[in-house]
Amino acid sequence: MTLLALGINHKTAPVALRERVTFSPDTLDQALDSLLAQPMVQGGVVLSTCNRTELYLSVEEQDNLHEALIRWLCEYHNLNEEELRTSVYWHQDNDAVSHLMRVASGLDSLVLGEPQILGQVKKAFADSQKGHLKASELERMFQKSFSVAKRVRTETDIGASAVSVAFAACTLARQIFESLSTVTVLLVGAGETIELVARHLREHKVKHMIIANRTRERAQVLADEVGAEVIALSDIDERLKDADIIISSTASPLPIIGKGMVERALKSRRNQPMLLVDIAVPRDVEPEVGKLANAYLYSVDDLQSIISHNLAQRKAAAVQAETIVEQESGEFMAWLRAQSASETIREYRGQAEQVRDDLTAKAMAALEQGGDPQVIMQDLAWKLTNRLIHAPTKSLQQAARNGDDERLTILRNSLGLE
């Protein structure tokens, strides 16, 4: 039995290829059935995200295994083998275990240390269990990887610092305001970055969110998801005074929030401080706003410096995380080897017990027929000894005939002779 991990990701393949190798949730069951129908595959898990498609497999060793699996992947997705072959990576046994642990821990992600991948790996594993996963070694590998990912999160700072603009904006807000549960946030725009910001704010239980956008329909979809109020861009001047935090990210070619607008808002707020985070390029907030007392303006460049600092911290944490992965993968492979030995021991013990039972039954039958107990017991002992040492004796003789001193030494040690 061999453990394999093969696939493509953002490092090895462009999005144009990655999107053609994905497995949709609707067809995943069919894909797993097809994969497990391959004669060499004993068990499998398919992980398919926007940045990676990977197969984790328990397989029987055979010639051309690599080619057979790539052929299956290409046939399933109607791809040219040459087109895919140069982008596929391949890990076996300890390397496969280490790879899965790194993936689950966020060490192989586009955004180093991102936590979402662990949920995606868990879902892939859960989907494979619905009548598909057949290899206990593979199941144990995934369970171990989940515990390793948790250990990495607990023992390192891999996920402690913001490394995305959206997350950095929210982190900044949480650093300045002791609790977001008492503040009102005005979000200007409704694009992807603002969507991420809104979700982060919801997770931190912000008191109230207002979304201002050029098109109400797009803003309303996001507002319904996060429980926010929607206003038009033209209403910002009137509502700015209600906001403790303003986070803006639009595609407007001109500033949306001017110095005069903020001055009026501060006057209405009796100079209670306002945090303005402008993550738009071109800028949504006039730079002069930063000169106003009680108006604290941060641009995307300010956030980028925070992100760069935090990324350096994550990279330092990743070194510690890699040490954890190396240790845990080594322990898992030791367990796997022990399991293999346990199976051999069970077979050997079962064989010996069968010999014992057969000879004991014959001895009991002889006793019931009135045979001499002493003779019967001596015969039983002699036959039992011969039967049990027959196979080791043949192995010793074969090693001696072949001049295999190393094998002789191993056999002697195994038999307790040295």
UniProtKB/Swiss-Prot annotation:
Binding of substrate, residues: 49-52, 109, 114-116, 120
Any Pfam family: GlutR_dimer
Pathway info: Porphyrin-containing compound metabolism; protoporphyrin-IX biosynthesis; 5-aminolevulinate from L-glutamyl-tRNA(Glu): step 1/2
InterPro entries reported for this sequence: 4pyrrol_synth_GluRdtase, 4pyrrol_synth_GluRdtase_dimer, 4pyrrol_synth_GluRdtase_N, GluRdtase_CS, GluRdtase_dimer_dom_sf, GluRdtase_N_sf, NAD(P)-bd_dom_sf, Shikm_DH/Glu-tRNA_Rdtase
Entry GO MF terms: glutamyl-tRNA reductase activity; NADP binding
Superkingdom of the organism of origin: Bacteria
One GO process term, biological-process aspect: protoporphyrinogen IX biosynthetic process from glutamate
Catalytic residues of the enzyme: 50
Binding locations of NADP(+): 189-194
Keyword Lipid biosynthesis: no
Catalytic reaction(s) noted: (S)-4-amino-5-oxopentanoate + tRNA(Glu) + NADP(+) = L-glutamyl-tRNA(Glu) + NADPH + H(+)
EC category name: oxidoreductase
Important for activity, annotated site positions: 99
Keywords for the protein's UniProt record, in alphabetical order: NADP, Oxidoreductase, Porphyrin biosynthesis
Subunit organization: Homodimer.
More details: During catalysis, the active site Cys acts as a nucleophile attacking the alpha-carbonyl group of tRNA-bound glutamate with the formation of a thioester intermediate between enzyme and glutamate, and the concomitant release of tRNA(Glu). The thioester intermediate is finally reduced by direct hydride transfer from NADPH, to form the product GSA.
Purpose of the protein: Catalyzes the NADPH-dependent reduction of glutamyl-tRNA(Glu) to glutamate 1-semialdehyde (GSA).
Protein family (similarity comment): Belongs to the glutamyl-tRNA reductase family.
Protein name per its UniProtKB record: Glutamyl-tRNA reductase
Record organism: Enterobacter sp. (strain 638)
Gene: hemA
